[in-house]
Amino acid sequence: MPKKQLLLLSFLLFTSIEVRSQTGFKFSNETAYLSELVTHNSENPGQKTHFIGWLLNTSTLKMNEKHSLNLGLMLTHGGEPSADIVGDLQTFSNLEAGSLYGFYEMYYQYQTDGFWLKVGQQDLNTDFLVSENGLLFTHSSFGIDPVATIGMPAPTYPPTAAAITAGINLNEQVRLQLGIFDGQFASLNDNFLTVNWDISKDEGLLYIIEPEFKLLNNRLTQKIGFYQHSGLFVDRETSNVSKGQSAFYLVSDYQLLEKGEKTANLFFQFNTSTKAVSDLNYYYGLGLRLVNYVGGKPNEIGLALGHAKLNDDFISVRNEYNLTSETVVELNYKQEVKDWLSIQPYFQWIGMNEINNPQRNPIILALRAYIEF
C-alpha cells in the first residue's frame, strides 16, 4: 500500500471525536463505511463477483454557531464491474469508483437560520439534483440523473470541484439554491484525489439554480432546476466545437401516506439538455419508498425504474455507446441491525437496447452494508 494511502487510512481511524476548546472552537469527526458484495450475469468476459466499498471521514471545526471549516477524506476499493465488464450506461452501483484515496469535499461554511453559504471544493450532488426518497437506492441514476453526469464533466463522487454555493429560505414554502462550479472537476494524480482550484477559460464554469417548493400541506417537495455549462463541447451533428450546454430538470418527492411511523413515498426525476452537444436526449426516473412496513427496527423497501434515452440520431453517439436507450429496475430492502449498522440486499434488472450484437440483459444481485463509527 502506498505511503500516502497508509497515512490517510490512519487518519480515518480517528472517528466519532468531539473536542471543545477553551476558545469556543468545537471539533467533530465522523466516519462511515459503505461496502457491498455484488454479482452479475453479464455475458461479457470478466470476474462475476466483486467486493467494493467507500470509506469517508468528515471533520468539522466550528468556530462559532455560524462559521465552520469542513474536510472530507475518502478511500475507495474494489473493481469497476459496471465500466469494465457489464458495460451498462448508467453505472449500476453508486459506490463504484475503483481504488482511489484522497480529498473529497473541503469548504468553509457560513450558516444562519434560513441561509447558508459554502466556498471551497464541493460535490454537486450534495445540495443539487437530490431526491430524498431516491437516496435509498443503490443505482447511480436515482442519486443523480445521467444527463448531468454523462453529458458534462459534473463534479460528483468521486471527484469534486471548486465552487461557491448558497441557499436561502424565501418563506416557509419556497427555498432557492444557487451554485457556481469549476467547469472541470479536480483531476486524478494516479489514484490520488487532488485539490485543484485553477479555473480554465476553455473548461468554463457550471452555473446552477434550483428553486424548491413545498406544496400540498408540505407533502410534496418540488424542485425545478436549470444549469448552464459555459465550456467547449463537440457538436454531435457537425463535429465542430461549440460553446455551452444547458439543461432543465425536475425532482419531486411526495408523501403518499403516513400512519404512525409508517410512510409511503414517491419520487420522480426528469432531465433534458441541449441535444446537439449531449449524448443523452432525456432521462426520467420514478420510484416507491416504504418506511417501517416490516415490524421491529427501522426499515425501508424500495422499488424504482429509470430510463435514459440517447441521442442515437447522431452516428457518433451510436458508435460510442451501441445503444438507443437503457432502462433499469431496482428492488431493495434496507434493515437497521444496530444503531451503527444497516444491511441492504438489492436486485437490479438492466434493459440495454443495443443496436448491434445484442446480449442478454444483465441482472445484478448484491448485499450492501452501512457502517457508522
State what each model feature region is.
Residues 54-56, 105-107, 163-165, 208-210, ...:
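Membrane-embedded beta-strand positions in outer-membrane beta-barrel channels/transporters
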Residues 29-37, 71-75, 117-121, 178-182, ...:
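Transmembrane beta-barrel strands of outer-membrane/channel proteins
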Residues 361-373:
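Outer-membrane beta-barrel "beta-signal"
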Residues 214-314, 331:
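Detector for outer-membrane/organellar transmembrane beta-barrel domains
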Residues 60-183, 278-286, 290-294, 298-315:
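Outer membrane beta-barrel
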Residues 34-42, 76-80, 126, 149, ...:
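Sequence/structural signature of outer-membrane beta-barrel proteins
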Residues 21-27, 60-70, 114, 173, ...:
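Short loop/turn motifs that connect adjacent beta-strands in outer-membrane beta-barrel proteins
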